[in-house]
């Protein structure tokens, strides 16, 4: 296509339906059996009620909603006001139980960092393969580099991954791939340093400059230690 319009829901359902049609399993079950269990990760798309006690209760600072209320300069706020997005929706049992592949994964930072660490090392670690080199190359090849038609912001996307501007300031590099999340969370791979990084939070914040100071301090410490 020639245009990009970011949407947090549809991409996962489209990819998830391919998994259902080709493999027969749901996206959550496929990921659990083919990726999560073999690699010893804590990651769920469709959280069982028996695991509820391990899930963080989400909350948000009032400023976390500023980007939804940013006015009528772009169509972006409208997309998240139909109905208005709530930071506490993930606390509901129905949301946790559902499989919304692009939006309701439940994971800890260690598991996300491990996953991206394997990808940062080319998809294979210790003789175990998560993705072939060719599959990883195709997954991270730039599909769109331009202006998002909804947010009007510069955007670079591969097959689901954001490319480049994922960390902040001195820790942004063209080869990074991963994704940011509302309120400060982020997970990405830095292939040049063979590094996987993740920061997740139960307390969503808002930032005038777009940089979460918690994430910034962690990134500074990690890169200083390399």
Regions flagged by a language model, labelled:
Residues 187, 194-204:
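Short, well-ordered beta-strand elements
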Residues 21, 204-205:
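Short strand->helix junction
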Residues 182-183:
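Short, small/polar residue-rich loop motifs at catalytic or cofactor-binding pockets
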Residues 105, 150, 154, 178-179, ...:
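Short amphipathic alpha-helix initiation/capping segments at coil-to-helix junctions
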Residues 160, 186-188:
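Short, surface-exposed charged micro-motifs
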């Amino acid at each position: 296509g020639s245009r990009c319009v970011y949407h947090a829901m549809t991409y996962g359902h489209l990819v998830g339906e391919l998994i259902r049609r080709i493999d027969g399993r749901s996206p959550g079950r496929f990921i659990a059996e083919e990726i999560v269990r073999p690699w010893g990760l804590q990651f769920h798309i469709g959280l069982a009620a028996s695991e509820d006690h391990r899930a963080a209760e989400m909350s948000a600072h009032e400023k976390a909603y500023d980007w939804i209320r940013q006015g009528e300069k772009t169509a972006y706020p409208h997309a998240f006001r139909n109905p208005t997005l709530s930071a506490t929706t993930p606390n509901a049992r129905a949301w946790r139980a559902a499989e919304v592949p692009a939006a309701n994964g439940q994971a800890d930072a260690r598991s996300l960092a491990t996953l991206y660490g394997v990808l940062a090392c080319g998809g294979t670690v210790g003789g175990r393969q998560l993705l072939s080199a060719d599959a990883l190359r195709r997954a991270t090849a730039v599909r769109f580099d331009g202006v998002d038609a909804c947010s009007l912001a510069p955007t670079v996307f591969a097959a689901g991954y954001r490319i480049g501007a994922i960390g902040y300031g001195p820790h942004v590099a063209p080869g990074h791939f991963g994704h940011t999340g509302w309120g400060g969370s982020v997970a990405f791979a830095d292939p040049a340093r063979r590094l996987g990084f993740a920061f997740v939070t139960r307390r969503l914040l808002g930032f005038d400059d777009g940089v979460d100071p918690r994430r910034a301090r962690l990134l500074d410490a990690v890169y200083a230690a390399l």
